[in-house]
């Protein structure tokens, strides 16, 4: 632990946290400063020029990262009939209707994404107090309430990231892992940021993207110089 702290202290001493970093240098510093024995996530926090107290300025959406997030995504699917076979073939870990709802209530099964066919929403809405706070409530805008169960599962498994601003107008998301190639992290970030830009509400005035910070799970957080972006 002392060796780790000593190395981290040196890294922090060598980094100017007041500086705005170009995207390539920023990613390089995050990778260089990683000093834990697990594959850290690369996270982004985007401070938006919105009023989160006004419902017409809140942002919610999703996008598919070209290189995925680097984690094994467990999917729960609320559906019935022929869709059960489709969901199994597509790789969903948990599938069902009332029985799946009971599993969630009583066993507290863990998953990263919940998908539902429209005819299952009566059951899903009963789980609002459980799924809502965890950001797992299926939503048509996110493509997680759909008749195309196969596509929704594929998207979730291959890098779909759902996002929404918090009460402070900040969006948080994971866009990769520390062992990704620099260009992979950069391409994931560019796709994510482009999605946020497209989601700008008309009611938002002034500077929309105020600040962008990239960080690793246990490492440093650095502020991006937005002039270095090509999008």
UniProtKB/Swiss-Prot annotation:
GO terms for biological process: regulation of translation; translation. Keywords: Repressor, Ribonucleoprotein, Ribosomal protein, RNA-binding, rRNA-binding, Translation regulation, tRNA-binding. GO terms for molecular function: rRNA binding; structural constituent of ribosome; tRNA binding. GO terms for cellular component: cytosolic large ribosomal subunit. It comes from the Bacteria. Gene3D superfamilies: 3.30.190.20, 3.40.50.790. InterPro entries: Ribosom_uL1_bac-type (IPR005878), Ribosomal_uL1 (IPR002143), Ribosomal_uL1-like (IPR023674), Ribosomal_uL1/biogenesis (IPR028364), Ribosomal_uL1_3-a/b-sand (IPR016095), Ribosomal_uL1_CS (IPR023673). The keyword Ribosomal protein applies. The keyword Lipid metabolism does not apply. Part of the 50S ribosomal subunit. Binds directly to 23S rRNA. The L1 stalk is quite mobile in the ribosome, and is involved in E site tRNA release. Belongs to the universal ribosomal protein uL1 family. This is Large ribosomal subunit protein uL1. It comes from Buchnera aphidicola subsp. Schizaphis graminum (strain Sg). The gene is rplA.
């Amino acid at each position: 632990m002392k060796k780790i702290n000593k190395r981290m202290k040196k890294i922090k001493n060598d980094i100017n946290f007041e500086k705005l970093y170009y995207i390539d240098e920023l990613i390089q510093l995050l990778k260089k400063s990683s000093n834990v024995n697990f594959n850290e996530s690369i996270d982004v926090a985007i401070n938006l020029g919105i009023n989160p107290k006004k419902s017409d300025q809140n942002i919610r959406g999703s996008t598919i990262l070209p290189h995925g997030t680097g984690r094994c995504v467990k999917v729960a699917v609320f559906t019935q009939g022929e869709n059960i076979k489709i969901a199994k073939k597509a790789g969903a870990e948990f599938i069902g209707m009332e029985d799946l709802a009971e599993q969630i209530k009583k066993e507290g099964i863990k998953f990263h994404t919940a998908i539902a066919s429209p005819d299952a929403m009566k059951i899903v809405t009963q789980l609002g107090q459980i799924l809502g706070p965890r950001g797992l409530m299926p939503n048509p805008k996110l493509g997680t309430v759909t008749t195309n169960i196969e596509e929704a599962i594929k998207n979730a498994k291959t890098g779909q990231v759902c996002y929404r601003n918090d009460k402070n107008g900040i969006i948080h998301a994971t866009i990769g892992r520390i062992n990704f190639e620099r260009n992979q992290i950069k391409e994931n970030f560019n796709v994510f940021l482009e999605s946020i830009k497209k989601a700008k509400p008309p009611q938002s005035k002034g500077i929309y993207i105020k600040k962008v910070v990239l960080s690793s799970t246990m490492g440093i957080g650095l502020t991006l110089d937005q002039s270095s972006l090509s999008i």
